[in-house]
Structures are given as structure tokens and as C-alpha cells.
Amino acid sequence: MRGGLWQLGQSITRRLGQSDKKTIARRCYASEADLKKTVLYDFHVANGGKMVPFAGWSMPIQYKDSIMESTINCRENGSLFDVSHMCGLSLKGKDCVPFLEKLVVADVAGLRPGTGSLTVFTNEKGGAIDDSVITKVTDDHIYLVVNAGCRDKDLAHIEEHMKAFKAKGGDVSWHIYDERSLLALQGPLAGSTLQHLTKEDLSKMYFGDFRIIDINGSKCFLTRTGYTGEDGFEISVPSENAVDLAKAILEKSEGKVRLTGLGARDSLRLEAGLCLYGNDMEQHITPVEAGLTWAIGKRRRAEGGFLGADVILKQIADGPAIRRVGLFSTGPPARSHSEIQNEKGENIGEVTSGGFSPCLKKNIGMGYVKSGLHKPGTKLKIVIRGKTYEGSVTKMPFVPTKYYKPA
């Protein structure tokens, strides 16, 4: 799904629980001087953050806790992430909904104001340009967040189509929130911790809901969502107030919510069975192949009207040739691009994400296999560094999700 762990995800999971971060830095960007810094950079360093290059930014991969410890603490208590490298933007105007529906597969018109959904931006061939959480603030205002590694191409794509749409008389404009920072508060203590900092009754705010409210004295965009499988929030806050808000959240949790880096964020999303763009989804993978058919609204399936609709709707009707699956495996953790074979040793697919699960204490992964071999329990083999190991297809999520929903 989200978080923009675009170039880094493979490296993070490869070193889960280890201390060598130099290789990660080398994989991404050569010069520290070229990297952008979020407004929380000094705060990260002061709190022991181990900074690494990621998608053009200097970001914390972990703090004093190990990645495994941070993963487990998020599941048991809570985590606070700086995800300000991601790009928040608004589309406004009386035609912003029909405009966005040309670019994404979601039934945006069908969303109630103050609610949102995961969606996918598609290209003319039905492939995924990016995934994004979109929110209908009002009928003429859409708020969305796109991945850091996809920012430039996403904005160029939106701008290109917006110009053509406006040239035909469409009423839509946009604003990119470079003046705001984005924090993600995740875990079972997220709601009770944040409640200390706002008068808004968060118990009435459910998974996918959106509010513009005062938090710790700042006007914030609050979405009950996340990238961990846990209950939680993403908080868009004016950048000048971001450090104070981070400090207040940690203080109100009495030390139970901890600062957490991109390393644990990756293991958490993998345990939750969430896609990492650049690994589990790319421009040649459709939402149907990625197991995201549920994100294509019923009306959109009937009417189409989005880029690549002919390809995607045919796959829904006939079935895709390949499918994303969850994987268990023996031996060392499977890595991106590891070959998947059937029991006869024939190639049937490829691993896209893999690592050791801190919560399950076993190897987990995701990948694509030929349709017909995607059913849970299917035995297979995974080739890692020239050696073959036993594996099997399994259901996802690996760890049950705990999204806050009405009883």
C-alpha cells in the first residue's frame, strides 16, 4: 500500500534485526548533501535516529530500539513515524470528483464527505502508477497522499491530465501541501494517546474517516488510517508545529508510544499484507493482479471511465494470468526477485517482498504466481542464492489487522 518505501524496502527487510545500515545508504543516494530533510530531522538525530537516504530524503531507519523491538512495540503499544517525505495535496472545484475518477479506480463520487479509501492511479494499459489513500473532504474538495518515491511522476501525471480537463471547461485546481508535515501514530494506544491532545471525540471516528480539527493547538488534517495493520492516524500538521506535536504525543503516552523508523514500518506493512509500490506493485501490474479488485467500486466496474479500464474490467471478468499471494518459506528469508517454482522445479513466479516476521517468528513474503497456483496451501519452492527451499502459499494478512470500525 503506502509509505513510499520504494527503493528501501528490499534492503530494510534483508537486514531486519541487524545493525549494518551502510549498504542501505549506498543503494539509494550517493551524497548526503543532496538529500532533503524533514522539519523533524534534528529531533530524530537528538533521539538517536539512524539516518539513511531514502527517495531523496534523509530519514530514520530506526532509533535506539532494534527493528524487531520496534515492530513488536507497535503491535503491543504504539509507534510514531515521521512520514513527511510523502506528498499531500488537495484537488478542489465542482468537477474535482469526475476529474479524479478519470485517473483512479475508486468510486470517489460514492464516498461520503469525511470518508476515504485506498485507490490506485492507473495508466492506459491498466498498470499501477501508484497507490494512494484519497479522502472526500466535501463534494468539491478531495485530499490525498501519494508515495515519496512516486511524487514527481504522480504530480506530472495529474498535472498533464488536469490541463487537458480544464481546457475542456472542467473546474478543478490543486494545492500541494509542502508547508505541512505528516506524522503517523499507529498501534493500540493511538486513540487514547491522541485523545489527550484534542477535544474532538475520536471514539466516533472510524477507520477511513477524515476530520479537520485542532490537535495540540494546531489545525490538523486527521485521517484514521495507516500502513501497519493497526489502528492509528495520519496527522497533517503545519510544519512549524510538527516537532511540538511529536513531543506531545510521546509525552502523553508516558513512554509507551515510541519513535519508530522505516525499518519497522516495512516489517509491519509486510506482516499486514500491504503492498509496497516499486516491489509488490509496478506500472506493469494491474490492481486485479495485485489483489486489489475490492478497491474498484461496483459502479466503476459497470461504467469504467478510468485509464486502462478495458484491460482491468476484462481481467475481472476472465481472471488475471498472475496473482499476488502470501508466502511462507523455510531457510533464509526470501528476497525480491527470488524465483518461485512448482514442486517439479518449473518457474511459476517471483517473490516481490520478503523478510523475517518479528511477530510470527518465521519467514514471510509476497510474490506473484500463475493463476491456479495461488490457492492457500499450495506447495512450492523458492530459490535463494542458488539454493532451493520449501515454501507454500498462505492467506494474508499474516498478522490480523485491528482497524477501528463500528461494532
Swiss-Prot record:
Residues 1-29 form a transit peptide. GO terms for cellular component: glycine cleavage complex; mitochondrion. The keyword Plastid does not apply. Substrate binds at E234, R265, Y403. It is found in: Mitochondrion. One of its GO terms (molecular function) is aminomethyltransferase activity. The keyword Transit peptide applies. Its EC number is 2.1.2.10. Belongs to the GcvT family. The glycine cleavage system is composed of four proteins: P, T, L and H. This is Aminomethyltransferase, mitochondrial. The gene is GDCST.
